[in-house]
Amino acid sequence: MTRAATAIGATMLSVGNVRLDTASCTLVDPLGEEHLANREFQLMELFMRNAGTRMPTERLMLEVWGEDAPEGANVVWVYISYLRKKLTALGANVAICASRNQGYSLEVVEESEQA
């Protein structure tokens, strides 16, 4: 089941049980919070604003890194890996899912799928 991001006040986005505080660049969850580096924040904000929508790597690179994007998709994979680790540490019920040759999306994960 996928839910679009819900805006909470002017500085919060919410998907599943995770909130993104856009003022402090922090992921907030019932278990705690994780501060995000600049690129991590930009990528997570893009995912949360487009929850459930597959986005090709090229779009992620253009929107987060802009015209100065490094060649190759490895940099996107690395930052997605950082975000996945932080989401896991928080016990989030959302995951960044990969679809071969189609891109990545942020999805709400049912409890049975998390185990």
Question: Predicted segments — roles?
Answer:
Residues 26, 31-36, 42-79, 88-90:
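Positively charged, aromatic-enriched patches within helix-turn-helix-type DNA-binding elements
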